[in-house]
């Protein structure tokens, strides 16, 4: 069993039907140890609230989906020790720190970050950091 870090762009696909939800659910079903920084709960809550405001979910549906997140990700990492290196990379790349926190979590546990965020993957392409990132569309079970 390997450890993988997932970000909110993947985890939200476990909760609500989106493009690539089938692949995200396959990833969850592998039995790999999936972890994320604690920040993911805020990002998932934001994504579900946005879907509620857009009329894609009722408030009760969003609350139900949010309450089920711990069954998917019981191990959340504290962000305090990830902040400094994530901040440095965010400044260097001129990119929001949120994505870099997930990347730093992957580096800390010597794992791959699986993301559906193509913009982030494109931003780090060609850097040494890219070797820690796998797009959900490129992910394959071992």
Language-model region placement:
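Short, conserved alpha-helical segments within structured domains
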Residues: 40-41, 61, 82, 102
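Phosphate- and divalent-cation-binding pockets in alpha/beta enzyme and binding domains
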Residues: 23, 43, 85, 122-124
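Short loop->beta-strand "edge-of-pocket" segments that line small-molecule binding or catalytic clefts
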Residues: 31-35, 70, 112
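Acidic, PIN/NYN-like endoribonuclease modules and their adjacent C-terminal/linker elements
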Residues: 1-3, 103, 107-142
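Short, well-structured N-terminal submotif of metal-dependent ribonuclease cores
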Residues: 1-40, 51-64, 127, 142
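Active-site neighborhoods of divalent-metal-dependent phosphate/nucleic-acid chemistry enzymes
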Residues: 74-119
């Amino acid at each position: 069993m390997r450890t993988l870090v997932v970000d909110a762009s993947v985890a939200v696909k476990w909760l609500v039907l989106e493009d690539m939800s089938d692949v995200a659910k396959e990833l969850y079903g592998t039995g790999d140890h999936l972890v994320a920084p604690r920040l993911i709960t805020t990002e998932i809550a934001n994504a579900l609230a946005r879907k509620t405001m857009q009329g894609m979910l009722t408030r009760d549906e969003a609350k139900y989906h949010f309450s089920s997140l711990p069954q998917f990700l019981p191990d959340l990492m504290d962000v305090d020790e990830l902040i400094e290196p994530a901040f440095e990379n965010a400044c260097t790349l001129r990119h929001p720190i949120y994505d870099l926190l997930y990347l730093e979590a992957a580096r800390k546990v010597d794992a791959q970050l699986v993301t559906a965020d193509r913009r982030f993957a494109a931003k780090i392409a060609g850097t040494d950091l890219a070797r820690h990132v796998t797009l959900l569309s490129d992910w394959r079970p071992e």
